[in-house]
Swiss-Prot record:
Positions annotated as active site in the UniProt record: 132, 245
Name of the protein described by the UniProt record: Aspartate-semialdehyde dehydrogenase 2
EC code(s) of this entry: 1.2.1.11
Pfam families: Semialdhyde_dh (PF01118), Semialdhyde_dhC (PF02774)
Domain notes from UniProt: Consists of two domains, an N-terminal nucleotide-binding domain and a C-terminal dimerization domain.
Physiological role: Catalyzes the NADPH-dependent formation of L-aspartate-semialdehyde (L-ASA) by the reductive dephosphorylation of L-aspartyl-4-phosphate.
GO biological process: 'de novo' L-methionine biosynthetic process; diaminopimelate biosynthetic process; isoleucine biosynthetic process; lysine biosynthetic process via diaminopimelate; threonine biosynthetic process
GO molecular function, one term: NADP binding
Pathways involved: Amino-acid biosynthesis; L-lysine biosynthesis via DAP pathway; (S)-tetrahydrodipicolinate from L-aspartate: step 2/4; Amino-acid biosynthesis; L-methionine biosynthesis via de novo pathway; L-homoserine from L-aspartate: step 2/3; Amino-acid biosynthesis; L-threonine biosynthesis; L-threonine from L-aspartate: step 2/5
């Protein structure tokens, strides 16, 4: 990558935005000039990037014509407003919010799963980053899907509070400190107390009884696999862990496959770290700061002749958001610029 690119991060002061900055630097993305953008209240804040100090600018006053690629993670409403403006100025926007994910002409991309979909960015100059839980699940399931097909996915997620941003992290920390010191916990970000608790609700409830987070996994899986016939049955749970999401995944395959075959395939797949036997990954011990999807507890389902069980763990802020976006940008500049 000898060519250099002007890159903007919109939502630069949020948890994902700050991690995007780290990942761009760690992966040595070919940045010529970096622009950090946020709302007026964050204007003037500074960050270090490649040995230089970069000042956060007010997005309302920014000239998008300076930028080749923009990574958006400032919330759906702001993406709805600014992504079309940036795209019209010639910027390729990689959006981390859910706003554009279900538009038929916007590609929804996990680089390890459907990299060919990136080509569709030319439709509107926008690429959507999937939901964190969908990303890690589909990276793990792609080898199985390619080998024997998947009829149905049952998944229960155990999602950390960082999925709700800095407010979620602060609420868990604050509630834990208060409760351990004998004070009542205040609840603002989540529907119930999150400290020492599990909440089977992420996002709002839909008319069918599922939450929006759960339905995201359904819609996104079908779109990314380009397979509307695949059935997905999710339950999404918020747990009192700061970083990292875990998932108990059960799949019914279109043809039987042995767990040993599955493990052999996973072991040979880029982006996956496999744990065999009695060893297994956890959010706290293994996921933090990693860009791989971690898979363990792979076994045949004793109740179904074509069933496979997996335990899937990843850093939701990195692979579930920032790293996936940067990986999309890497493919974009490698194959399309």
């Amino acid at each position: 990558m000898s060519q250099q690119f002007n890159v903007a991060i919109f939502g630069a002061t949020g948890a994902v935005g700050e991690t995007m900055l780290e990942v761009l630097q760690e992966r040595e993305f070919p940045v010529d000039e970096l622009f950090l953008l946020a709302s007026e209240r964050s204007e003037g804040k500074t960050y270090r990037f490649n040995g230089k100090t970069v000042r956060v600018q007010n997005v309302e006053e920014f000239d998008w014509s300076q930028v080749h690629i923009a990574l958006f993670s400032a919330g759906g409403e702001l993406s709805a407003k600014w992504a079309p403006i940036a795209a019209e100025a010639g910027v390729v926007v990689i959006d981390n919010t859910s706003h554009f994910r279900y538009d038929y002409d916007i590609p929804l991309v996990v680089p390890e799963v459907n990299p060919e979909a990136i080509a569709e960015f030319r439709n509107r100059n926008i690429i959507a980053n999937p939901n964190c839980s969908t990303i890690q699940m589909l990276v793990a399931l792609k080898p199985i899907y390619d080998a024997v097909g998947i009829e149905r996915i049952n998944v229960t997620t155990y999602q950390s509070v960082s999925g709700a941003g800095k407010a979620g992290i602060d609420e868990l920390a604050g509630q834990t400190a208060k409760l351990l010191n004998g004070y009542p916990a205040e609840t603002n970000t989540f529907s119930q107390q999150i400290a020492f608790n599990c909440i089977p609700q992420i996002d709002q409830f839909m008319d069918n009884g599922y939450t929006k987070e759960e339905m995201k996994m359904v819609w996104e899986t079908q779109k990314i696999f380009n397979d509307p016939s695949i059935m997905v049955n999710p339950t999404c749970v918020r747990v009192p862990v700061f970083y990292g999401h875990a998932e108990a995944v059960h799949v019914e395959t279109r043809a039987p496959i042995d767990a040993e075959q599955v493990m052999d395939m996973l072991e040979q797949t880029d982006g996956i770290e496999l744990f065999r036997g009695a060893d297994f990954p956890t959010q706290v011990r293994d996921a933090g700061g990693k860009d791989h999807v971690l898979v363990g507890r792979v076994r045949n389902d004793i109740s179904h002749h074509s069933g496979i069980n997996l335990w899937v763990v990843a850093d939701n802020v990195r692979k579930g958001a920032a790293t996936n976006a940067v990986q999309i940008a890497e493919l974009l500049v490698r194959d399309y610029f």
